[in-house]
């Protein structure tokens, strides 16, 4: 139906006859001439219709051109010629196609929005097929496509095996709710959609495949936000006979190559490395954005003897923290803006936010200054590096909570005070805690997942020091986003059983849920490790968008709905009966 793509028509084709197909982007009838911007996936070319006096065929052609509306689907035949008025904004701007024939392949109904408009998100998602025609959406989807293609080429060239793992599998706890699928042939039993291929890829290492990868679809029934969807895609990788640096060095080289190929970005020749403890101490986050130079400063030792009980209580608590965040130029903040920062911190658990504001002339404005002697106050300001024109925020309380809300303030301040440097800041975060304590459940939970190896090989040591145990987990962070997470795995069945026990998973429960894994580990499992990268998140970063929904062809809303297909939707009673499911009225 076509000989060339619209966006690729250029001067080399001048004088030649071409056949094009695409959508009417714009049609302009200027009376004596019609201009049609014809669009396909490669771009736009101008089609010109010039009626010739006394020529019935050209008059009919002009009539067809004048009748065109937005998004009508056309086939156009014509001769390429040089444009009199060059359009430098178009790749095809030096040429035009003089139409000799126009066939309307399909008329478009009146549009809810035009391809060059940017309507509200609900409208975009309801008419996703129209939204995806927009040039910006085409660009972002193509970025994702190029990313996946580049990853496959890179890994295939290095002897990785692309192996599929099951979509219908066993329900195993991995931190989020499973999506459950009734098993029609086994009444009362259910499959689960995989939250990740974690256990299968470990078993593939036991099976001797050595290097595995998969562009894997994963499913988690959890609350949605801009960087989270119910179903998502990850690059899943696993290596046999490796230590942490083997995995990290390989994927670091891979990311440098991929970013260069896909978006022509040169990532750092060597990614910085930071332990989890250092990241939390300096930045209040396990995925710090290193483009923001602001750092948290611990001040517990300087406020232990103050008369401010909020500070003294936290400073004298072994699990407490008093941290300061200096914002250069922050003295310009009004009281209302300071209250806004306090409200932002409250979202992350802060019960209050103390501050010291120093005017350009050195005047102090602070609700906590009265709790300090003159020398102690001066020492505090010196310790945090505060000067005229600055504001210093303080957080006090439990270590983790203070780190969280002060880290959130750091990000907010960095953006609002234009302190985010240009460029790309990759980072390895290592040495994560093995466990964290769940006050509600009164037990340990795995910080990464239950299959991450501890840094110690001795089970007795792990049991005795579970509270402070460090794992062999690692995350790759880019511009404040965790783009990949991995670890060295447990490959000994006795260690895996001990970790289950520390997580409150007894032998009987472990056998019921993970018996297949424990059995596999018993038959000569090699030391192994791996990592998984979020394709959606990396594509969003490459495309320069805040929301992963922009790089997913058919995403869900934050309300977990597909507005285009109207999913989820009720199921007929006979279908439910086939899978032995009965809907009960919601209890009020």
Swiss-Prot record:
Positions of region (Aspartate): 198-201
Keyword 4Fe-4S applies: no
Keyword Cytoplasm: yes
GO MF term set: aspartate-tRNA ligase activity; ATP binding; nucleic acid binding
Keywords carried by this UniProt record: Aminoacyl-tRNA synthetase, ATP-binding, Cytoplasm, Ligase, Nucleotide-binding, Protein biosynthesis
Pfam families according to UniProt: GAD, tRNA-synt_2, tRNA_anti-codon
Residues that bind ATP: 220-222, 229, 482, 534-537
GO cellular component: cytoplasm
Any GO BP: aspartyl-tRNA aminoacylation
Top-level EC class as recorded in UniProt: ligase
Reactions that this protein is recorded to catalyse: tRNA(Asp) + L-aspartate + ATP = L-aspartyl-tRNA(Asp) + AMP + diphosphate
InterPro entries reported for this sequence: Aa-tRNA-synt_II, aa-tRNA-synth_II, aa-tRNA-synth_II/BPL/LPL, Asp-tRNA-ligase_1, Asp-tRNA-ligase_1_N, Asp/Asn-tRNA-synth_IIb, AspRS_core, GAD-like_sf
Known EC number: 6.1.1.12
Residues where L-aspartate binds: 174, 220, 448, 489
Location(s) in or outside the cell: Cytoplasm
Family, similarity comment: Belongs to the class-II aminoacyl-tRNA synthetase family. Type 1 subfamily.
Subunit text: Homodimer.
PANTHER family: ASPARTATE--TRNA LIGASE, MITOCHONDRIAL (PTHR22594:SF5), ASPARTYL/LYSYL-TRNA SYNTHETASE (PTHR22594)
Functional summary from the UniProt entry: Catalyzes the attachment of L-aspartate to tRNA(Asp) in a two-step reaction: L-aspartate is first activated by ATP to form Asp-AMP and then transferred to the acceptor end of tRNA(Asp).
Name the record gives this protein: Aspartate--tRNA ligase
Species per Swiss-Prot/TrEMBL record: Xanthomonas oryzae pv. oryzae (strain PXO99A)
